[in-house]
Amino acid sequence: MNVPVLPPIPTDEVSPLPVAERPARVATRGGALDLLRLLASLLIVIYHFGAEGPMRIERFGQVFSRGFLATDFFLMLSGYVLGRAYGASTLTGRISHGRFWMRRVGRVWPGHLIVLAMMAALVLVLNAIGTDAHKPSRFAWDQLPVQALLVHAWGFNSDGWNLPSWSLSALVVCYALFPWLWRAADKVRRPWILPLVGALAFAACEVVARLVFHHALPDLQFRFGVVRALPLFILGVCLARAVEMEWPSERAAKVLLIGGFVLLVAMQPLDRYALPDELIFDLPCLTAIAAIVLGAGRLPVRHPKAWIEEGAKLSFALFITHIFVGVIYWSAVHKLIETVPIGIGWQWLMWLASFPIAMGAAWLFHTYVDQPLQDRLAPWLRGKR
């Protein structure tokens, strides 16, 4: 249950105030939000690799079965980051609606296609070898075109291949709506109203999910990902506009950040499905995540850390490559365990080794594939060629 990680905020496009009123630029990278982005991406990998160890790791704690919380964070953060990065540009007309959408799709689609092509080639090789260690049923060829086109969260069924990319598909729709959403948020003059607007959007989509699909929002099938992603994206946009209006105060932001963490941690021992209704768990967690995003976003980054910024930049690459890496690694590991007696301790070590391997692969992809490709595409996406 994963979600895309956004690229860095373009430093030339963050403008919360009219030109004449802009304060000196403050650092936006290397702070709390970047650290949270990195930690959430790691939680997503842990969630997806959790079933591959000697025993399912949710036995050690409910939090390891809750990848949807990291997904909620990323979807909300997507709206927040775009609001901070592109909000002013969409209002002033410096970037057109179509150009904005092309930039956003151009950021996520090429990398997605490359990883999907590598995955298809890998499956062909594994099928030719005759192994079933990669669980061939997960790779139905008739579902590949839908996923390649990034429309599999628009009601089309595609539950295999690079499964977490459903959130990219959903965000493509959110990107198309962003300029209108930001203009609507810009009309609100009292910043405290904005989080309430986001909460109402979530409530409306929760009602739709229950009446039409008979599930709570986090439990929707991935093919209905747009319904799940849109309210969280809207809430992120609303929080970004509130921060641009310098709300709340820095003191209140610290309280929100700490209080959000405390509430989120306090909810984790609860069994979500043992409660009378999933909302008893979902609403406090959503409130906590929103408080964390708002609090961390409002606080200035006074001591940016380069390692945090670089780690956050890897989050998108980690998101789109970890399933591909997992297919290779876990196919080999499970085949090895089937053929050679390996103690439980060594099996746990092999499980732990999967995380630095996934991070290393993400770094290679980011450094030698995704970033060079983005550098090549940038002039066209910016309309300079």
Where is each model-derived feature located?
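Central hydrophobic cores of alpha-helical transmembrane segments
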Residues: 193-203, 254-263
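Hydrophobic alpha-helical transmembrane segments
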Residues: 101, 109, 113, 192-196, ...
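His/acidic/aromatic-lined binding-pocket segments of jelly-roll/cupin-type domains
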Residues: 72-74, 231
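Membrane-interface helix-loop-helix regions
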Residues: 97-98, 102, 108-170, 203-219, ...
